[in-house]
Amino acid sequence: MLKKDMNIADFDPQLFQAIADETRRQEEHIELIASENYTSPRVLEAQGSQLTNKYAEGYPGKRYYGGCEHVDIAEELAISRAKELFGATYANVQPHSGSQANSAVFMALLQGGDTVLGMSLAHGGHLTHGSHVSFSGKLYNAVQYGIDEATGKIDYAEVERLAVEHKPKMIIAGFSAYSGIIDWGKFREIADKVGAYLFVDMAHVAGLVAAGIYPNPLPHAHVVTTTTHKTLAGPRGGLILSACDDEAIYKKLNSAVFPGGQGGPLMHVIAAKAVAFKEALEPEFTAYQEQVVVNAKAMAKTFIERGYDVVSGGTDNHLFLLDLISKDITGKDADAALGLANITVNKNSVPNDPRSPFVTSGLRIGSPAITRRGFKEEQSVELTNWMCDVLDDITDQGTIERVKNQVLELCARFPVYG
């Protein structure tokens, strides 16, 4: 018999210490990685439930195992809430990650070797949008578009030119490091012009979309994917959505997830997704997303005022890229210096970056996590000035130590889990 008082601390003190140290790091460090967020205790409760014990291959009402009547309810709740949240007529909540959701879309709509047109990783796209190191670039003929160097915005004329030239079977819109607002309708016009599917990856802005702050791609795209963490602030996982009202596509998508790419779904994670979707339907979630954008704009503006270059000159969403080329600082060194001051960012390539992806010339900065712990515009500006103090001279240990102490004081005032 398994006793309820079993615990990690007694059985595996090494692992327990690692978990405790990470918990402390999250409380004492300021998190600015745009793809990270803090999920709620309710989501953590669902994810740590006994649903983790249940195998449930298949879909609600059509499983390959018995005893699924209760987990069916959990999955049906997640599906119905996802549809309501985004205005979808189809939702698959089983993908284990955003990349696996994207893989399922490729599998459902394409054949190996088909041409796809996606945003270059070097210009803000994602690995799964056609990068040569990803399945999307290895198994398919990937053509890449980028941004206009003068404006920092997507060059729709280039997208259309490449689409007409290469006749892709699928066009991918979406990003991992782009601070503008995408014109989903323009992408659909281009896709229709060449007879392509439009696939939107809204992983980074799904929370903003759910709150009505960022344009919803569902009315324009054949298929939309997202992660369920990031701005949605749920558990780590993936989601596929559609409002194209094409049952044939829906069937292909379901088959591509199971049995095409996955076996048993993670029912404890699906339950956690259901909780997160319910949270996102609450009015408080909209207020949170509005503050996310306010904070990001305030940070970008402050960096510019302090003499730093921001790609595209600002942001319209939750993130922006800091271009450090003019400061002759690598993203790697900037990341390390800020880390010593308890500020967590990630190095990131900037458009036409002369340095390798392992070094880079920029930082990607996002506001979802700091906003989640209660930061407003005042704290965001204060934090940005501290970051500039560190970046002005990354070798100044006195400044780094001073900023670290300021960060610790600020974190104590705004705990993640109060």
Swiss-Prot record:
Spell out which residues are annotated as carrying N6-(pyridoxal phosphate)lysine.
230
GO molecular function terms attached to this record: glycine hydroxymethyltransferase activity; pyridoxal phosphate binding
Q: Does the keyword Transferase apply?
A: yes
Q: Which residues bind (6S)-5,6,7,8-tetrahydrofolate?
A: 121, 125-127, 356-358
- Pathway the protein takes part in: One-carbon metabolism; tetrahydrofolate interconversion; Amino-acid biosynthesis; glycine biosynthesis; glycine from L-serine: step 1/1
| EC numbers, comma separated | 2.1.2.1
Protein's name in the database: Serine hydroxymethyltransferase
Q: Which organism is this entry from?
A: Shewanella sediminis (strain HAW-EB3)
